[in-house]
Amino acid sequence: MIFDLIKYNSRTAIIADNGTSLTYAELANRVQDRAQLLQEGVLEFCLCRNDIDSIVHYLACLEAKAPVVLLDAQKDEATIQHLRDIYLPGVTKCHPDLAVCLTTSGTTGSPKLVRLTQRNLLSNAESIVQYLQLDANERPITMLPMYYSFGLSIINSHLLCGATILLTDKTYAQRDFWNFLKENQATSMAGVPYTWEMLKKLRFFRMDLPSVKTMTQAGGKLNADIAREYIQNAKQADRKFIVMYGQTEATARMSYLPWYQAEEKCGSVGVAVPSGRFELVDDQGNVIQESHTDGELIYYGDNVSMGYAECAEDLLKGDENNGRLATGDIAHRDDDGFYYITGRKKRFVKIWGNRCNLDQIEQLVKTLTTPCACIGVDDLVTIFVTIDNIEQDIKQLLITKTGLNSRAFEVRVIDAIPVTESGKIDYATLKSIV
């Protein structure tokens, strides 16, 4: 297995919010006992919560070399059964390099999975330990589900360095979460943009959290103004606010923005993680050498997955990516080698012949109100907000910034912006209500 748990022996590995704690030696024993019940090469399902049993099952699968699909334990039974019918856990034989399968979208309704190896997991965990300078004194609190690649990467990287994981399924909207954080002196917090937007509304900047020394953000682009507020708050509180960028297809992390350059390079996703590298290509596939020129971002590294699976037979496939991932993100590089994501290839629409970046429009609207979300079809962009009497302000801003007529924009007020289980905006649901 990639984690040498016994190496940290009597150190505390996990403190759960039910009061249970395990040393690394105790965790290793539980993992060994569970692993003996599993068959090498035969697919397992792990219905995950942020609890000890889920982590033991996950680690036991790695130990036994039984490939495991990590799924949300709270997902409805019909969806889980649908996936069981497709992938046949307990029966399906898998490729010998396959270790973990994760869903691609933050929802478990789609049968499409990303196929990861132990090498992928280890490479990414080692990179994270290196660039975040993690050690055994860390005490991260779980704010993301472990079936989501970002959440799993936090568990992996901290187990690798002998840290103590504060394990909870409570959310930041619950008082018990904050009590657990304070009582156990959490040293780091992690979230997607929606997390940090909501924490700002909960007056995070006024909270007294002296133990928290690191805050990390990934899973999408955080509004630049909000990012600056967190960067300034971090400086005042002697903390680090670290922006990162990744995809499940790369086992979570591909880049990070060094905390000491966060203010200077605000809006950037930084530089590639230590084990990887980036390049940009144009529409013809030619490598872009110039700075400040948009192209598709390509990532190379040992953390790039083997590919996708959409049926049980796909789990026998070998490595289809060979360490290269076309991210589908449009980006440019500045003169110092820092990368900036400008949008998704699939998040562009044509408005009366003009190419329109929905992600950039969303960021503009966020200067007036958060949360918000934008979707579009040719010749119309629909903006969803949660407050009334702001339609004219939004339209005037977008007319000024884009040069487009007001008829290109529609503003809708809804009760709440739908999000996926991993906290990202659920654009599919928004499209269904248009």
Q: Across the structure, where does each feature detected by a protein language model lie?
A:
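Conserved AMP-binding/adenylate-forming core of the ANL superfamily
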Residues: 10-39, 77-80, 116-119
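Conserved AMP-binding/adenylation subdomain of ANL enzymes
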Residues: 122-139, 149-188, 273-275
